[in-house]
């Protein structure tokens, strides 16, 4: 976290309070806020022409790295093969509406659709309400190119109840039709991190391991890229680079094959 950006955010809020009676750090939207970004991006994705190869740009934790987000957008826009961008949570740093707006203003310059999951930083203050207004549900799924993506909330520490992640919902989503060739789960906190609900870790990973055609579990949160099989159960977990590292993970998926590369920018 960079002190300069924190001071900028605080200064902006003070100026807004001085200049307008309308602004509150607790508000979930204003007249300039984008709405239903998930629905709009999914519509854009479904309108695109798919082929036998699915290409994903995967990154996470934008927080207050605005310059790095701009660099990411410029680089991805040069990658014509990319079908979809996945952002693994922590869109904001303090859950503030203005932070969400600053990041989405930049991400909306992408030439390809993007999907952003909710992170633990996004739940600070009124951030959950901001996310729901700006993006939509915290848990949802969609199918593209015979691949089912299951987007879900794993920010267990931010909730006092033990129902995050929502295991019954997740089990139902993993029970897929035969025409689905592969399943990719996307969330912020990985199950092997201390911020995940320890009481649900075993059931969560076993659910993935027992699901036919489960391909990948993608996460952010830990602020470094990892790729492996932490439970030795055949399930591959990948965590993203963060925006400040100026690199993203590029995944090419076709047939029963997966090719991963790291793209600097």
Could you tell me what each predicted segment is?
Residues 46-56, 141-151, 177-184, 230-236, ...:
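Beta-strand-turn-beta hairpins that frame and shape the catalytic cleft
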Residues 69-139, 143-144:
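Core catalytic region of metal-dependent phosphoesterases/phosphodiesterases
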Residues 21-37, 43, 59, 226-265:
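Binuclear metal-dependent phosphoesterase catalytic core
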Residues 20, 77-84, 159-234, 261:
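His/acidic metal-ligating clusters that form di-metal
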Residues 18-102:
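N-terminal active-site segment of His-dependent metallophosphoesterases
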Residues 13-16:
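C-terminal motif of bacterial Sec signal peptides marking the signal peptidase cleavage site
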Residues 2-9:
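Sec-dependent signal peptide recognition
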Residues 58-61, 84-90, 113-120, 152, ...:
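Active-site neighborhood of phospho(di)ester-bond hydrolases with catalytic His/Asp-centered motifs
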């Amino acid at each position: 976290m960079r002190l300069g950006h924190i001071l900028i955010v605080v200064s902006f809020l003070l100026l807004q309070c001085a200049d307008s009676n309308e602004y509150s750090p607790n508000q979930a939207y204003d007249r300039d806020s984008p709405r239903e970004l998930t629905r709009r991006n999914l519509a854009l994705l479904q309108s695109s022409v798919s082929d036998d190869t699915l290409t994903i740009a995967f990154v996470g934790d934008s927080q207050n790295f605005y310059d790095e987000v701009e660099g990411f957008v410029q680089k991805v826009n040069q990658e014509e093969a990319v079908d979809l961008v996945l952002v693994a949570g922590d869109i904001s740093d303090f859950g503030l509406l203005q932070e969400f707006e600053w990041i989405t203003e930049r991400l909306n310059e992408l030439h390809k659709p993007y999907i952003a999951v909710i992170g633990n930083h996004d739940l600070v203050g009124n951030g959950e309400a901001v996310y729901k207004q700006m993006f939509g549900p915290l848990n949802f799924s969609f199918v593209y190119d015979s691949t089912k993506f299951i987007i879900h909330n794993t920010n267990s520490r931010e909730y006092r109840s033990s129902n995050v992640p929502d295991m019954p919902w997740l089990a139902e989503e993993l029970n897929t039709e035969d025409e689905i060739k592969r399943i990719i789960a996307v969330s912020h906190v990985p199950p092997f991190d201390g911020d995940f609900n320890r009481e649900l870790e075993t059931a969560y990973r076993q659910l993935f391991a027992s699901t036919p055609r489960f391909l990948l579990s993608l996460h952010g949160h830990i602020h470094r890229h990892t790729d492996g099989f932490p439970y030795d159960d055949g399930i591959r977990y990948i965590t993203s680079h963060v925006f400040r590292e100026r690199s993203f993970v590029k995944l090419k998926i076709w047939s029963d094959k997966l090719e991963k590369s790291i793209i600097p920018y």
